[in-house]
Swiss-Prot record:
Subcellular compartments: Cytoplasm
Residues covered by the tr-type G domain: 8-273
Gene3D superfamilies with a match to the protein in the record: P-loop containing nucleotide triphosphate hydrolases, Peptide chain release factor 3, domain III, Translation factors
Family, similarity comment: Belongs to the TRAFAC class translation factor GTPase superfamily. Classic translation factor GTPase family. PrfC subfamily.
Annotated InterPro entries: EF-G-like_DII (IPR053905), EFG_III/V (IPR035647), G_TR_CS (IPR031157), P-loop_NTPase (IPR027417), PrfC (IPR004548), RF3_C (IPR032090), RF3_dom_3_sf (IPR038467), RF3_GTP-bd (IPR041732)
Disulphide linkage map: none
The protein's name: Peptide chain release factor 3
Top-rank taxon: Bacteria
Amino acid sequence: MTLREEVEIRKTFAIISHPDAGKTTLTEKLLLFGGAIREAGTVKGKKTGKFATSDWMEVEKQRGISVTSSVMQFDYDNFKINILDTPGHEDFSEDTYRTLMAVDSAVMVIDCAKGIEPQTLKLFKVCKMRGIPIFTFINKLDRVGKEPFELLEEIEKTLEIETYPMNWPIGMGQSFFGIIDRKTKTIEPFRDEENVLHLNEDYELQESHAITSDSAYEQAIEELMLVDEAGETFDKEKLMTGDLTPVFFGSALANFGVQNFLNAYVDHAPMPSGRKTESGEEISPFDESFSGFIFKIQANMNPQHRDRIAFMRIVSGAFERGMDIKMTRTDKKMKISRSTSFMADDTQTVNHAVSGDIIGLYDSGNFQIGDTLVGGNQKFQFEKLPQFTPEIFMKVSPKNVMKQKHFHKGIEQLVQEGAIQLYRTLHTNQIILGAVGQLQFEVFEHRMNNEYNVDVIMEPVGRKIARWIENEADIRDAMNSSRSILVEDRFENKVFLFENEFATRWFLDKFPEIKLYSLL
């Protein structure tokens, strides 16, 4: 198979949603259809003893939420699919954001009872900004929820994107009968999936069935006719630019409508795209020369070995285990002899991978998030990955001073994952951690105890706003202000931490010569 042929069968996407919309459950069912797993363990496994394949970290298993981004690959219908299950909790938006930089499309899961929720909106905006195709799966149709037209209107108005329903539900909740596939004019019954029913062009049922006298069926047919009369067509160009989302109805937990979605997804989702360098050059996925970038670092995927894995998205060319690659940031060459693919915590050695694939590289501390890796004598850097400005800051120290070595190793590794940000006060070298949300600190505390055997003390510093210094101004007078704390980030950039917006404005008025900026 040529490189082009290998690349063209790849599909790489992330699943995004608000917590509890059914994102991880949908991931499990997709893996089932891909033959990657034999039995789905749902995230509700904290009661049943089963755990979701994509939820591998101890804290995830206990809480039933996804707080890391899991990467899984499976084969389906002659395609190789790379699926990234992103953190659902809003506190982990920074990790999710970076993950969305490594995919070519996204699947948005919506709870039919709740519609568009805050986290869904936030993540959608990131996808929209990237201009990647977005597929929508409206979940939990076997429960009572909003009407289909209401949901479509909410998506269009709130997200400012056109919708095109690929199928249509018959009833919902207790009266949920199934879905009508608009393309094939078939009905897939919820309770009897094998017994597919057929409609003619006028939506008349070809088989004799009691459903024809059901009011939910009559309503669904009337609604579908209204949709058809509106005359909207499925515009693939609009899908590719992120201006139209195909909508699917189903129930991930009941494994219903999932294969209908998956079949359409592999038909319409894009193959791997290229990526721009800092100089604006577009690197094509079909370029023979290898290139890739690190978008995530995860420590302790195997706590027995205290290992670190750097997740790399391949942008161009082919990766071969044992090949020499160069890290652009350091201009150093390295031989990659340990490379892996994932099924959550189950890993397999990767000998060969191409554009669109995501592989793990064992990391002894060489890699940073955003690193560009290239083959041969290439010299370019991909566009930088964005970083979020933290909104909560905590002083942190070990309860047991004899555990300093473990404490600092834990801090170093967890900070390098990018889930939490590190700062140090200028004169006392006090460690301060910054996060987007409170849950990140809870997970940090749990992992320090569980993975590094260190109990930590965390104290709020009373600061909520971080601003980086943009110019080389004299900051000696500003350092003595009681309304701010001067710290350095892990790259030794100087940062002021403020109590609130008022304190920030006061500082800017008092010291106009100091120019400040914030991250995203």
